[in-house]
């Protein structure tokens, strides 16, 4: 509906990527039909009654143009910009396109070539910047741009002490030039005026009211391009030219020349009385904003409004397409941006202003009546049971028949606004055949008697709406999708049979609605022809289409070539566990694999049974032996985790020798030497020294430090003072009823439970049993 303003010129001029046609035409940038009289009927995508849609008409006039309205240049990276003078094939320097946009700014606003230059020094810097950017790809086109008749002009802004002109690109070739205005007192910097947010400190020339006021920190002179269709500023969430990094081979310069791209997205605007569709991140009461701005600012409210209707996570650079083609905004009439010239066909500047004024005024009046900012809030509310009727009532109004142009409009314009200007055009070099074949076959595969289910315009994103509402939004579509499933007889697939009770939402649960395979899921005309295109549209997720830039012709043409017969025969190889939808293989989670046990012989089943019995016997054996050698288990599993310990049997107080425990040769000091078992080895160490675990000697008085002291709880015995002289008699007492442990005489020990201090799980409780005679065995 709104995308062909620029593509008409591209269709005429870019078959061979000869961008001079655009660069040398002052009127060609914004006069819709100045060079293309054959494409006047393509200005409104929704009014085309041809089954092949308006996109097919574009292909009839342009053999080398892709039938995506946003990307009609076969090899032109800047699909939407007829103003791009540097669209060399497959050149990825996005800075080359800034020059043409500044040129368009001159053409649009009629800057005076002699009076509106701020300063010759600054102007020279700007030309140097343009030359630097264009030398990367096309010096010839650059020379055609910078000439006496059509050179980019910098808007006049007075009292600016530094002229900073550089590209919005991440290109290493961007040139930043600064020059001082001679004779101007450098009282304050330009950024100081802007930080005060006092418009009066900056003297804007009234004659040049169309000056671009950029309040970014770096104060780029942004590239204003008239051919941004709906005259809206694209707030791109700080992506601007960088956002096409995912499509460097396809559309690197595409999105950035359609709009004014903001660095910080807070205060950029165009003070132009013809441009009412100003998009800002936050509502503003500033008088410089137009009166109707508050009703339209939801278009770019952090891109959330667009994300509700489009899976728009990375490359949402054509917000006006989302806005005017959205089924929820269907009450908005078609604004006459596609015919900006006078009725008499004269391509003068007055026609543009009149067309914009009339179209926007009429459109805004209807918007005020039918659609306000509250509609965005209304969608943000909890989705109730009337959600089905909301879609059905709002979807078909003001739309052309779904089986004709609207279906392809979904394919090529709105399927996945991650690449608005590059829908169905992952590969500018290859998608010519891909899209042409697809659209030529769509007419014959459409079911004219079946209604549309839903459009790709309605594709809520998980990233922007709550999971509850996302689930309900597709759950509400379950009923029509079930009908759609039954009517298309997908259950009779030659590869896999699915019960008719299975709904499409269940089949596509993991693939489609996660936006990981199908992009934005357009199910129009009761066939799944659009699935081929959707896979090509999602450049962010579908690695197959993004990486195989040279193979899309083979992939998609093979699929689309059989759409006329709808016979599912071309891709039936190796379709086990898949459902073939119009020759497009789609993996589904419901496909049941053959039961392996059905193919096993009786002998194999017996062997399996025997193995299971053996395992059960082993388990029972372990259970029967679990109480044996419990002290050894206790030692290996628990005591070995402590640095120092001694274990006495309850009835036999002699020291149990787990290792080669020789006599306490060092037990001569008052400091009490003892054997410590560290990781299964004997370590003779004095208490004065810190062992490698930095623990203290355990006894009944330091149990808070060492939990092993719990083992040494005695039921009776002498106090430590009474056995102070028994340090050297440890060996002689080995066969008595008492034993020496440091300064403590122990006669009897009671069994205790060692419990893991961090949990109370019974599995972590180890019981110490008495009279375990097999502890050393």
UniProtKB/Swiss-Prot annotation:
Compositionally biased intervals (Basic and acidic residues)? 597-606
UniProt region (Disordered), positions on chain: 1-101, 128-150, 219-267, 334-366, 391-466, 529-577, 590-622, 713-751
Q: Where is the composition biased (Acidic residues)?
A: 344-366, 607-620, 718-730
* Compositional bias per record (Low complexity), positions renumbered to this chain: 128-147, 243-265, 408-466, 532-574, 731-740
Q: Where is the composition biased (Polar residues)?
A: 334-343, 391-407
Q: What is the protein's given name? A: Putative uncharacterized protein DDB_G0287457
């Amino acid at each position: 509906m709104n995308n062909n303003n620029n593509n008409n010129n591209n269709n005429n001029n870019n078959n061979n990527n000869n961008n001079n046609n655009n660069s040398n035409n002052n009127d060609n940038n914004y006069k819709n039909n100045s060079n293309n009289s054959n494409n006047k009927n393509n200005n409104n995508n929704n009014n085309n009654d041809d089954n092949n849609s308006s996109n097919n008409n574009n292909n009839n006039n342009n053999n080398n143009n892709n039938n995506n309205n946003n990307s009609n240049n076969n090899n032109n990276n800047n699909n939407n910009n007829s103003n791009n003078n540097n669209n060399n094939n497959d050149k990825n320097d996005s800075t080359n396109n800034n020059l043409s946009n500044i040129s368009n700014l001159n053409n649009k606003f009629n800057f005076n070539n002699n009076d509106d230059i701020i300063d010759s020094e600054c102007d020279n810097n700007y030309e140097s910047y343009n030359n630097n950017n264009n030398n990367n790809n096309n010096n010839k086109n650059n020379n055609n741009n910078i000439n006496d008749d059509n050179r980019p002009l910098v808007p006049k802004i007075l009292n600016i002490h530094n002229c900073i002109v550089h590209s919005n690109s991440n290109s290493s070739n961007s040139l930043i030039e600064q020059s001082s205005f001679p004779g101007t007192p450098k009282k304050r910097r330009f950024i100081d005026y802007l930080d005060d947010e006092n418009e009066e400190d900056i003297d804007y020339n009234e004659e040049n009211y169309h000056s671009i006021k950029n309040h970014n920190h770096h104060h780029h002179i942004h590239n204003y391009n008239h051919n941004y269709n709906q005259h809206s500023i694209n707030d791109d969430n700080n992506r601007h030219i960088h956002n096409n990094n995912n499509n460097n081979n396809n559309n690197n310069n595409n999105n950035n020349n359609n709009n004014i791209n903001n660095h910080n997205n807070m205060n950029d605007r165009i003070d132009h009385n013809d441009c009412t569709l100003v998009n800002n991140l936050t509502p503003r009461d500033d008088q410089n904003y137009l009166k109707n701005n508050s009703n339209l600012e939801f278009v770019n409210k952090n891109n959330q409004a667009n994300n509700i209707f489009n899976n728009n996570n990375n490359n949402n650079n054509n917000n006006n397409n989302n806005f005017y083609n959205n089924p929820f905004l269907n009450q908005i009439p078609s604004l006459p941006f596609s015919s900006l010239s006078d009725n008499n066909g004269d391509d003068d500047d007055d026609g543009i202003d009149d067309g914009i004024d009339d179209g926007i005024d009429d459109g805004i009046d209807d918007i005020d009546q039918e659609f306000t900012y509250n509609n965005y809030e209304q969608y943000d509310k909890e989705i109730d049971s009337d959600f089905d009727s909301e879609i059905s009532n709002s979807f078909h109004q003001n739309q052309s028949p779904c089986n004709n142009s609207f279906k392809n409009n979904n394919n090529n314009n709105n399927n996945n606004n991650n690449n608005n200007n590059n829908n169905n055009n992952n590969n500018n070099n290859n998608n010519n055949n891909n899209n042409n074949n697809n659209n030529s076959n769509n007419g014959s595969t459409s079911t004219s008697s079946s209604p549309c289910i839903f459009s790709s315009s309605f594709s809520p994103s998980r990233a922007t709406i709550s999971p509850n509402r996302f689930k309900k939004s597709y759950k509400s579509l379950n009923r029509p999708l079930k009908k759609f499933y039954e009517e298309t007889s997908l259950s009779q697939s030659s590869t896999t049979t699915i019960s008719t009770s299975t709904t499409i939402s269940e089949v596509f649960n993991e693939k489609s609605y996660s936006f990981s395979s199908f992009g934005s899921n357009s199910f129009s005309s009761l066939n799944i022809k659009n699935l081929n295109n959707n896979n090509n549209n999602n450049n962010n997720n579908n690695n197959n289409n993004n990486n195989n830039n040279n193979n899309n012709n083979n992939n998609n043409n093979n699929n689309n070539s059989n759409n006329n017969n709808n016979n599912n025969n071309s891709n039936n190889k190796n379709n086990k566990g898949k459902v073939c939808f119009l020759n497009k293989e789609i993996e589904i989670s419901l496909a049941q694999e053959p039961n392996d046990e059905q193919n096993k012989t009786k002998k194999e089943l017996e062997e399996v049974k025997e193995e299971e019995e053996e395992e059960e016997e082993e388990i029972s054996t372990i259970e029967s032996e679990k109480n044996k050698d419990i002290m050894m288990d206790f030692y290996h599993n628990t005591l070995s985790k402590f640095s120092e310990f001694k274990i006495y049997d309850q009835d036999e107080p002699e020291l149990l020798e787990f290792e080669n425990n020789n006599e306490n040769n060092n037990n001569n000091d008052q400091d009490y030497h003892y054997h410590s078992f560290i990781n299964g080895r004997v370590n003779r160490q004095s208490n004065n020294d810190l062992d490698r675990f930095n623990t203290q000697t355990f006894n009944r008085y330091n149990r808070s430090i060492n939990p092993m002291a719990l083992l040494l709880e005695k039921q009776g015995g002498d106090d430590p003072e009474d056995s102070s002289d028994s340090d050297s008699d440890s060996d002689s007492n080995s066969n008595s009823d008492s034993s020496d442990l440091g300064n403590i005489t122990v006669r009897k020990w009671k069994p205790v439970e060692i419990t893991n201090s961090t949990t109370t799980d019974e599995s972590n409780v180890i019981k110490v049993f008495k009279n375990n005679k097999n502890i050393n065995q």
